[in-house]
Design a protein with these regions (language model features):
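Non-catalytic, well-ordered alpha-helical scaffold segments
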Residues: 18-25, 43, 63, 80, ...
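Alpha-helical repeat scaffolds in large eukaryotic proteins
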Residues: 28-32, 50, 70, 91
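Compositionally biased non-globular segments, especially hydrophobic aliphatic-rich helices
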Residues: 13, 26, 44-47, 75, ...
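Acidic, low-complexity, intrinsically disordered interaction modules
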Residues: 37-78
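Amphipathic alpha-helical binding modules
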Residues: 64-100
Length: 100
């Protein structure tokens, strides 16, 4: 996929996708450990993913990932599902060499 940053190599985009996937999954571990940093970690992810929107060519999945993360913050009963949905959506983003 050709990205809007002409000089960004696809392997760097792939590494960013892997980072997002791992960071989102890490929220599950924080949640299970009752970490006081769950909320701030999710907010940081929302900011990072939102900031990468242009890099991923304004794909609609970016908004859905952010929406899932926000719902995870606000609806504890939906936390696990929303986090897993967000992580799986990272895999659907076009860009990079392969899927996460």
């Amino acid at each position: 996929m050709r990205n809007v940053y002409e000089n960004v190599p696809s392997n760097q985009i792939e590494k960013q996708k892997r980072y997002f996937y791992g960071a989102i999954i890490n929220c599950l571990y924080l949640w299970e450990d009752n970490s006081p940093f769950v909320d701030s970690t999710i907010q940081t992810l929302i900011n990072q993913i939102g900031g990468s929107n242009r890099l991923f060519g304004y794909q609609p999945e970016v908004l859905t990932i952010i929406s899932n993360l926000e719902t995870a913050r606000r609806e504890p009963s939906q936390f696990r599902k929303c986090i897993l949905d967000a992580a799986n959506l990272v895999d659907t983003l076009k860009g990079g060499d392969s899927n996460v």
